[in-house]
């Protein structure tokens, strides 16, 4: 499920990280049945995709730098995924989310 979401991403600046962050966020919230067009709903209020992009954009520079440092894209995805998962798990509040 997460692999499909990452494979559908373009290689444009910010989109790879945005896709990884949103995939990890959906995975972390047990929202495997959500499609890519769904909004996250936390306590009845929708989180717009712009909020997810605002979180993902600073990491786009890390992704672009990683592409020049590492030859394998799997290394890049692994490093960004681990860092992103750590940040999401430590920074996001514990709320019940569902697809909306």
Swiss-Prot record:
| Gene Ontology CC terms | membrane
Location of the protein in the cell: Membrane
Q: How does it sit in the membrane?
A: Multi-pass membrane protein
Which keywords belong to this entry? Membrane, Transmembrane, Transmembrane helix
Source domain of life: Eukaryota
Membrane spanning stretches: 50-70, 75-95
Add the further remark from the entry. Almost completely overlaps ECM7.
Q: What is this protein called?
A: Putative uncharacterized protein YLR444C
Q: State the species of origin.
A: Saccharomyces cerevisiae (strain ATCC 204508 / S288c)
């Amino acid at each position: 499920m997460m692999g499909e979401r990452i494979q559908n991403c373009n290689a444009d600046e910010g989109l790879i990280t945005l896709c990884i962050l949103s995939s990890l966020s959906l995975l972390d919230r047990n929202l495997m049945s959500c499609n890519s067009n769904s909004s996250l709903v936390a306590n009845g209020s929708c989180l717009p995709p712009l909020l997810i992009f605002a979180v993902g954009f600073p990491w786009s520079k890390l992704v672009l730098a990683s592409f020049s440092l590492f030859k394998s894209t799997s290394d890049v995805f692994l490093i960004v995924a681990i860092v992103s998962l750590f940040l999401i798990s430590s920074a996001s509040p514990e709320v019940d989310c569902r697809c909306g």
